[in-house]
Amino acid sequence: MRYISTRGQAPALNFEDVLLAGLASDGGLYVPENLPRFTLEEIASWVGLPYHELAFRVMRPFVAGSIADADFKKILEETYGVFAHDAVAPLRQLNGNEWVLELFHGPTLAFKDFALQLLGRLLDHVLAKRGERVVIMGATSGDTGSAAIEGCRRCDNVDIFIMHPHNRVSEVQRRQMTTILGDNIHNIAIEGNFDDCQEMVKASFADQGFLKGTRLVAVNSINWARIMAQIVYYFHAALQLGAPHRSVAFSVPTGNFGDIFAGYLARNMGLPVSQLIVATNRNDILHRFMSGNRYDKDTLHPSLSPSMDIMVSSNFERLLFDLHGRNGKAVAELLDAFKASGKLSVEDQRWTEARKLFDSLAVSDEQTCETIAEVYRSSGELLDPHTAIGVRAARECRRSLSVPMVTLGTAHPVKFPEAVEKAGIGQAPALPAHLADLFEREERCTVLPNELAKVQAFVSQHGNRGKPL
């Protein structure tokens, strides 16, 4: 499998190189040159497979030529063997034809475990084969950091440095990062805000000289391997609800468009998906595009669903590439204009093509709390705020009551106690058994000033274990 850039000017790469590259050299994002397509007979034969076996069948074409089948099977078995539920991603019925796909049974209780548990193991495998070692730098406001650290904690060839704003993440989120103790794990609390952390990561990627030749790798949602891993659970859910002989619809809480783009790819690979709903909060750049062909940058508004608090959606470029007939030059020109003006729209026929599959809804904090309370009263299920937004969008935007509607349950409610408390249900979520002692565990974290030079000196000093810098 070869991968090409959405902007058309970077060389095509194989899976190994894409895994390590993150962004393409022309600033674009990598996508498969040719998307595999499965027949209905193939998809039907996967009914009842354990999650890791289904994952092998769905993802095998993407790693072909880079990872041997036996190695990939072993990696997948290890990846999904650490999840706390036997089904890995169980379906929970809310009522009638309405379902929640629980994606929070991984080590850090968020959907990001599906991709980052795999990404860490893939990196370690590829680096061992190459005899290389890399440094991962990332910034987090909570969930991504803990999932990335948990995914890389046993990697022999990776040193990971995650920055979070000092005293600005919840105690649960902080402890999920700082209680993972390993020689290759480095938590840095920056005396600043999340944007300060993000800017330091960007500056480090732009000028990697401080690492003296060691490669810096990104694990955020632009990395193709994360999108690839998320395709699987769309097949997993749909197969339990009658696919491929029956269509299924999905409502997806999304800010960066990565999770829902995986559903779009699943459909293009042969899964009968009749509708994809973009469910978002008041930071609604995706809703404004889907509802009115206006992708305009706006002010950031903090919300009860912080994982969707974004101004620009980093994976939206991958959809634009397809809407423009995979014309990288057209996408590059469009995004250059967006960078200059903060505004983007596409030709009417391209937007109409997107609307054949996509619907969207922006949900306020008040509506989010209403939905948490309503679902709890009617079904006994306690939702996190992101999942509640997905359920609200599913109920308001679904096109057919006869088609199963699946909302992606993106996080465990224990991660967002403020939203649950504001919903007024009088029920506080409890930590799962494997995290019951979280508040007693030893923490390890380094507090650093908001100064790039001091952060880079720390990374240079502690990174690349076992090899001179």
From Swiss-Prot:
InterPro entries: Ser/Thr_deHydtase_PyrdxlP-BS, Thr_synth_N, Thr_synth_N_sf, Thr_synthase-like, Threonine_Synthase, TrpB-like_PALP, TrpB-like_PALP_sf. It catalyses: O-phospho-L-homoserine + H2O = L-threonine + phosphate. Its cofactor is pyridoxal 5'-phosphate. Pfam families: PALP, THR4_C, Thr_synth_N. Signal peptide: none annotated. The keyword Amino-acid biosynthesis applies. Its EC number is 4.2.3.1. It comes from the Bacteria. Keywords: Amino-acid biosynthesis, Lyase, Pyridoxal phosphate, Threonine biosynthesis. The modification N6-(pyridoxal phosphate)lysine is found at K112. Catalyzes the gamma-elimination of phosphate from L-phosphohomoserine and the beta-addition of water to produce L-threonine. Belongs to the threonine synthase family. This is Threonine synthase. The gene is thrC.
